[in-house]
Design a protein with these regions (language model features):
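N-terminal membrane topogenic signal
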Residues: 6-19, 65
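Membrane-interface capping segments at transmembrane-helix boundaries
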Residues: 10, 81-82, 135-142, 250-261
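Alpha-helical transmembrane segments of multi-pass membrane proteins
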Residues: 22-40
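Internal transmembrane alpha-helix with an interfacial aromatic "cap," most often the third helix
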Residues: 73-91, 98-120, 124-146
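Membrane-interface helix caps and helix-loop-helix hairpins in membrane proteins
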Residues: 106-120, 178-185, 204-209, 229-234
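Central hydrophobic cores of alpha-helical transmembrane segments
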Residues: 213-224
Length: 261
């Protein structure tokens, strides 16, 4: 009598793993916000330890995590459907989102543990997989169905947009934590440099991908930076000009071409 073994579909494993990792990362983030170590959440910790870091956005900006996690839940549920098991776009994405979510959990622990330089490494662990995933999904480069746009592309665009800003802020906090002198350049000037670099990166992404979701997240962050630092006109004006420029750029950016995928 022969024993037969049924091969598990690797795409099914991927679907389950992605959904489980998304749920796990949201649970960990929620616990860290409502029951943080020592009763100090991330926003409060940043305010207490980094009052002089002038690239920090206003606290309301962190509400962006609500649509980020809502989008990830939508992504997780959508990709887990049997009809999406062999979706070429999702197959190309592989386990990249899993790596990003795991790194997100690591970042939360490291930041709350005040291991700020190591938290930058974890943030890179979020950013790099998201960049590769963004490229593999070819977001904004081809027309796709509205369903795929809302449940696959937009969640990744919003997540990547915020992490693009967050890693700049995180790096600034890490440097401050080790008493980096800034090479004699004032914090306000460094903030302006960071804003300009962020706007330049966003310009390149917008020209190549014409991705309104990514663009709006950056604009949201720039406005929040300007509002937090109203007492420093140089930062506020630079952030406002950068935001206006990106808004105008979004109007003239090239539209995606190609067949539906």
């Amino acid at each position: 009598m022969k024993l037969t073994t049924q091969r598990i579909d690797p795409d099914l494993v991927r679907q389950v793993t992605i959904l489980a990792t998304i749920i796990g990362s949201i649970v960990i983030n929620t616990i860290s916000n409502f029951f943080p170590p020592d009763g100090v959440d991330m926003a409060t910790l940043s305010d207490r330890l980094f009052p002089s870091v002038q690239i920090l956005p206003a606290n309301y900006a962190f509400a962006i995590w609500a649509p980020i996690y809502l989008g990830l839940i939508a992504f997780g549920i959508y990709q887990a459907q049997p009809t999406q098991r062999h979706n070429p776009s999702l197959q190309r994405g592989g386990y990249l989102l899993v790596f990003a979510c795991i790194s997100q959990c690591a970042w939360i622990y490291l930041f709350l543990a005040r291991l700020f330089p190591l938290s930058v490494v974890a943030m890179l662990g979020i950013l790099l997989p998201l960049i590769v995933l963004y490229q593999r999904l070819e977001i904004g480069q081809h027309h796709v169905s509205p369903t795929e746009q809302w449940f696959i592309q937009i969640p990744i665009s919003i997540y990547l947009g915020w992490i693009t800003v967050a890693i700049v802020v995180n790096a600034a906090l890490a440097l401050y934590s080790i008493n980096w002198g800034g090479w004699g350049i004032t914090p306000a000037i460094w903030a302006v440099i960071a804003i300009v670099v962020s706007a330049a990166i966003t310009t390149l992404v917008t020209i190549e991908h014409h991705d309104p979701a990514y663009l709006l997240v950056i604009i949201w962050a720039l406005i929040a930076i300007g509002i937090r630092h109203l007492d420093t006109p140089l930062i506020t004006v630079t952030a406002a000009v950068a935001a206006i420029f990106l808004i105008l750029l979004s109007v003239d950016a090239p539209k995606p071409v190609g067949k539906d995928s």
